Regions:
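PLP-dependent amino-acid enzyme catalytic core
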Residues: 1-397
Length: 397
């Protein structure tokens, strides 16, 4: 059973295992609220997950420690369990979905754990971990639906409350619900006036749908760059706790997540993974139902694969109006490309790439398409460019 005493005990046990992460202001994230970032992406292993895993493993009996532990994860919980097991001299077996980022797989191995790759998503890895538990007598370290794990995650709330006064809301990423359950439980018992909002990716809204429907819903599939919260089904305990203590769960799109990752890089020189950036995305795109309030966004992790990061940055630039794709119909005669380029130059747009296309059934026999990618300042700048092109007689396709 989760209690405040258990959470305070977790904070005591974890003081030599985890670091107390900083709480920093982020004045440019939102024009409507005062945003502060709880930087769990700078935690040991790059994620908050080591808190819950560390506390749960610390509470095992000597017999359980001797047999070893097994866990499943989209990546971050794996590293937390692996590091905690290493600290206590315990053998750890970790089941990972085969789509887990390479960076997380290699990091898990680096802490000495045995990694078992499982075809599918988190829920498939979960099933395999339970099979190994039964076959080998291992202790299963649940990534979210366990009171000790939730107590470990709740220590984040204690740090937030100790480091900042006059908080109006805390915004938390939601996958299976362990992180937000712990934070919401602690906050509603210690400072019940503070609102707690959860954020899920639109492509993996299991807790959002479950709370809206009033019962646990299992999704047929999930698809999101926020792999750390790509969970088909919330936990039984976490669903009950979220129903009781969380004020609202909201969703953000893939483009909004990408924009948030980009904003953190540019404004704070900080790397966040997709799951870690969803709370910031909610603040950036005014999804939080508050104005002129002090809001803490939990940046839950920073373990993003560099190949994914490059694609996310490209998408973030596109979503925020920093790049744009145009298709312009031209007459196939000399000087047309020069005329278009002159418009771009006069408005300060930089050409990234150009593709000249003559063969298309849709165009006039004497025409051609110019497909072009531009570096722009914002959406207003894009509007200026498209207006200038139309005024010059060019047709946008």
């Amino acid at each position: 059973m989760l209690t405040l005493d258990k959470i305070y005990h977790a904070a005591f046990v974890l003081k030599d295992v985890v670091r107390e992460t900083t709480l920093i202001p982020s004045p440019k994230i939102s024009a409507n609220n005062n945003i502060y970032l709880k930087t769990e992406n700078l935690q040991v292993t790059g994620s908050f997950k080591v808190r819950g895993a560390g506390y749960m493993i610390s509470q095992l009996s000597e017999e359980e420690k001797a047999r070893g532990v097994v866990a499943c994860s989209a990546g971050n919980h794996a590293q937390g369990v692996a590091l905690a097991a290493q600290k206590y001299g315990i053998k750890a077996t970790i089941c990972l979905p085969d789509g887990a980022p390479i960076s997380k797989v290699e990091a898990t191995k680096s802490y000495g754990a045995e990694v078992v790759m499982v075809k599918g998503v988190y829920d498939d890895a979960y099933k395999r971990a339970l099979e190994l538990r039964d076959e080998k007598g291992l202790t299963f370290v649940h990534p979210f639906d366990d009171d000790d794990v939730i107590a470990g995650q709740a220590t984040i709330a204690l740090e937030i409350l100790n480091n900042m006064k006059n908080i109006d809301a805390v915004v938390v990423p939601v996958g299976g619900g362990g992180l937000i359950s712990g934070i919401a439980y602690a906050i509603k018992h210690l400072a019940p006036h503070i609102k707690v909002y959860g954020v899920q990716a639109l492509g993996a809204p299991s807790m959002y749908n479950s709370l809206k429907g009033g019962s646990i819903e299992t999704l047929a599939s999930v698809s999101t760059i926020a792999d750390g919260i790509a969970v088909k089904r919330p936990g039984d305990n976490t669903f009950k706790m979220c129903s009781q203590y969380v004020d609202e769960v909201i969703t953000v799109t893939e483009g909004e997540i990408s924009s948030a990752i980009l904003a953190l890089i540019e404004q704070h020189k900080m790397i966040a993974e997709g799951a870690g950036a969803v709370a910031v995305a909610a603040a950036m795109f005014d999804k939080i139902p508050m104005k002129n309030k002090n809001i803490v966004c939990v940046v839950s992790g920073g373990n993003i694969d560099v190949t994914i990061l490059s694609r996310v940055i490209e998408r973030g630039l596109l979503t925020s109006g920093r790049t744009c794709n145009l298709c312009i119909e031209l007459m196939d005669k000399p000087g047309q490309l020069q005329a278009v380029s002159a418009i771009f130059a006069s408005l300060g747009a930089n050409i990234i790439s150009v593709h000249h296309e003559r063969a298309s059934e849709a165009m006039d026999i004497n025409g051609c398409y110019l497909r072009i990618v531009l570096e722009t300042r914002n959406y207003e700048h894009i509007d200026m460019i498209t207006t200038a092109l139309k005024d010059a007689g060019f047709r946008l396709v």
